[in-house]
Amino acid sequence: MPAYRSRTTTHGRNMAGARGLWRATGMKDSDFGKPIIAVVNSFTQFVPGHVHLKDLGQLVAREIEAAGGVAKEFNTIAVDDGIAMGHDGMLYSLPSRELIADSVEYMVNAHCADAMVCISNCDKITPGMLMASLRLNIPTVFVSGGPMEAGKVIMHGKKVALDLVDAMVAAADDKISDEDVAVIERSACPTCGSCSGMFTANSMNCLTEALGLSLPGNGSTLATHSDRKELFLEAGRRVVALAKRYYEQDDVTALPRTIASKGAFENAMALDIAMGGSTNTVLHILAAAHEGEIDFTMDDIDRLSRRVPCLSKVAPAKADVHMEDVHRAGGIMAILGELNRAGLLNADLPTVHAPTLGEALAQWDIAVTDNKAALELFSAAPGGVPTQVAFSQSARWEELDLDREKGVIRDAQHPFSKDGGLAVLKGNLALDGCIVKTAGVDESILKFSGPAKVFESQDSAVKGILSNQVVAGDVVVIRYEGPKGGPGMQEMLYPTSYLKSKGLGKACALITDGRFSGGTSGLSIGHASPEAANGGTIGLVREGDMIDIDIPNRTISLRVDEAELAARREAQNAKGWFPAEKRKRNVTTALKAYAAFATSADRGAVRDLGGK
């Protein structure tokens, strides 16, 4: 029987000093021997997805203590990718993932916590905490802050739903007036919560459901809705039960590595492909698998992408559909249910809330259940009132979306496409693979060939696009923006948004060793591995080289013969793998430290410390 980790600091004569300090935090004699649960919050006033979390940690803490545990809260950092976008702030986004994972490990191990509730929400916070949970392997429940309501506005007599990306695209479109841009800007992000489309934050929060580490509704219940409060309360109760199961009954099914097994990672990736999630999820899923010592690679993702159809399209892939619409259709449990009926799910795996995922689906998939709690949960609707307050409204949809032929969520017999929403491409331009969000690619450009327009940084690409250097038919290549070369693997949302604003969204392709925001759509291919800074072929591309992209056949090729490539490689080895033009970029000591250990995207951009 495993002993409570916290006994190290709460029992024995030699721990009198530690107990004295615990007493100074409010603990009493009766608390020593109870499980100490870390409440890992990520409140910050910088990020709309986290601005409402300030009091929610204590909400969970009170429930933990009512259930027989001792709750101790601490905070991690949280970077807003949208605010950090388009300038050197984006260099810090991906590295913050490792800092978050490390900070959780530091706090939990330093104080010998027995279990934890992770209160996350936005882009790097959920992945960082997920990595920490698998690294630590103590009972853990995830509960996120929830998605933002979609913006809604009447423009030129028509009601439209908006999100962050609409504001970015409109601002760069000369055909849209300053007045209309101002209306879009003021309406795009109306409430607290993670941005309203299937961007990285919401994608990752949905994947925690598929991994079995969060409760039904975690990925789709709006931040503003009163129903979301119950998820936080239940997380507090559930984590104490998990802790007691493991430490008092030696039940390893309460542990993250048992729950989030390889089969669960396959489920998460199948969900990601079916819902057309952000390409960033690939990076984070690979990193989390690495932390859990799970053999899950790009080859597994490629295998799944060839089997799983696209069952849902959400903004940015479908501009008029947002997370609130996915929720009305049954949320993630509904998509998982359709995958299960198609034989594409491992349903016999444990979760934090049910003995098996299959049993959970029987209760929470609205296509098959008469469970009143499920039907009530998925009727939670947007309130339509701008606010930064959690649980502040209780609006209900009059009816649920149960249309599996033409609705927001489709069954496997009526998919948006038989090909899934994500694909791994390989070829001489990306020997270790690259990723494209096929759900956001127009069918007319699934096969594309064009001359390379090469840029040595995102900044120069933005200038080139806005100054009309890029024309229809070009393949924009942005290199030296990988984990090591950036450093930090910036998101390329501005270049893709500006291509759209120039009317080139369906007329150009973009390839990079950097990554893309979850808000990106179009023929945008990221994570080219190896990256340029690691000697990848993307560093050998020259202006005008022809590039061939074939998504149906999963290939990406530079039309240059092997002898010429070998000559270019020899010359580049002599010069060093650095950008051809000097960049105005302040690479600090912190960023240099990250770059020194960062691996390419095909390994999740995790750190290679030369050991495991």
Swiss-Prot record:
Cofactor entry: [2Fe-2S] cluster; Mg(2+)
InterPro entries noted in UniProt: Dihydro-acid_dehy_C (IPR042096), DihydroxyA_deHydtase (IPR004404), DiOHA_6PGluconate_deHydtase_CS (IPR020558), ILV_EDD_C (IPR056740), ILV_EDD_N (IPR000581), IlvD/EDD_N (IPR037237)
Molecular function terms from GO: 2 iron, 2 sulfur cluster binding; dihydroxy-acid dehydratase activity; magnesium ion binding
Domain of life of the native organism: Bacteria
Catalytic activity line of the entry: (2R)-2,3-dihydroxy-3-methylbutanoate = 3-methyl-2-oxobutanoate + H2O; (2R,3R)-2,3-dihydroxy-3-methylpentanoate = (S)-3-methyl-2-oxopentanoate + H2O
Comment on bound cofactor: Binds 1 [2Fe-2S] cluster per subunit. This cluster acts as a Lewis acid cofactor.
E.C. number(s) listed in UniProt: 4.2.1.9
Keyword set, alphabetical order: 2Fe-2S, Amino-acid biosynthesis, Branched-chain amino acid biosynthesis, Iron, Iron-sulfur, Lyase, Magnesium, Metal-binding
Binding site for [2Fe-2S] cluster: 122, 195
N6-carboxylysine: modified positions: 124
Family: Belongs to the IlvD/Edd family.
Protein role: Functions in the biosynthesis of branched-chain amino acids. Catalyzes the dehydration of (2R,3R)-2,3-dihydroxy-3-methylpentanoate (2,3-dihydroxy-3-methylvalerate) into 2-oxo-3-methylpentanoate (2-oxo-3-methylvalerate) and of (2R)-2,3-dihydroxy-3-methylbutanoate (2,3-dihydroxyisovalerate) into 2-oxo-3-methylbutanoate (2-oxoisovalerate), the penultimate precursor to L-isoleucine and L-valine, respectively.
HAMAP family found in the cross-reference section: IlvD
Description of how the protein assembles with itself and partners: Homodimer.
PANTHER family listed in its UniProt record: D-XYLONATE DEHYDRATASE (PTHR43661), D-XYLONATE DEHYDRATASE YAGF-RELATED (PTHR43661:SF3)
Name the UniProt record assigns to this protein: Dihydroxy-acid dehydratase
Organism: Rhizobium rhizogenes (strain K84 / ATCC BAA-868)
Record gene name: ilvD
